[in-house]
Amino acid sequence: PARTHHDITTRDQYPLISRDRDQYGMIGRDQYNMSGQNYSKSRQIAKATTAVTAGDSLLVLSSLTLVGTVIALIVATPLLVIFSPILVPALITVALLITGFLSSGAFGIAAITVFSWIYKYATGEHPQGSDKLDSARMKLGSKAQDMKDRAYYYGQQHTGEEHDRDRDHRTDRDRTRGTQHTT
């Protein structure tokens, strides 16, 4: 008889069940399903029990934390009220000092990183981002050269026009002088 896909996968996965099914018809498969259902029910019960246990223990821990916090506030509130004129400025000072030290350290690390990058770039190593810097430098250089060429070109045109005007003015002046001398 031709084997179906189900037969092939069942025989490959469960060789004893396949043998039982071949010998006893569907009995082997039915027994597998019943034991699988029992297995899956017991597994679900184990999962539920584990979840309930974990949830209960977390609930107890959160309750203990809440009770501890309330007791600490009950004890600490009178002390905080009595010592607040001293504690508040002290806490502000400590917070400012900590902020200052942390920001100073962060700026120091940033400066060291920048100097390290500049050193690598200056010594010929190619740190990350140096290709973008080189590209920007080339673009800026080409724009500067373009502006220099334009300024030179327009300067030549402007100087040439003034030169032509001066020459025309001198020629007119020379003509008028020449006519004055001849008369």
From Swiss-Prot:
Q: Where mainly located?
A: other
| Chain positions of sequence repeats | 11-20, 21-30
User: Where are its TM segments located?
Assistant: 57-77, 99-119
The membrane-topology field of this record reads: Multi-pass membrane protein
Report keywords, A-Z.
Lipid droplet, Membrane, Repeat, Transmembrane, Transmembrane helix
Chain positions covered by the region annotation Hydrophobic = 48-119
One of its Pfam families is Oleosin
The GO cellular component terms are: membrane; monolayer-surrounded lipid storage body
Q: Where is this region: Disordered?
A: 154-183
* Basic and acidic residues bias locations: 159-177
Q: Name one GO biological process term.
A: post-embryonic development
The superkingdom of the source organism is Eukaryota
Per its UniProt record, what InterPro entries does this chain match?
Oleosin
List localization entries: Lipid droplet; Membrane
Please give the residue ranges the record annotates as the region Polar: 1-47
Respond yes or no to whether keyword Membrane is given for this record: yes
Family per UniProt? Answer: Belongs to the oleosin family.
Q: Give a short account of what the protein does.
A: May have a structural role to stabilize the lipid body during desiccation of the seed by preventing coalescence of the oil. Probably interacts with both lipid and phospholipid moieties of lipid bodies. May also provide recognition signals for specific lipase anchorage in lipolysis during seedling growth.
Q: Which PANTHER family match?
A: OLEOSIN, OLEOSIN 18.5 KDA
Record-given protein name: Oleosin Bn-V
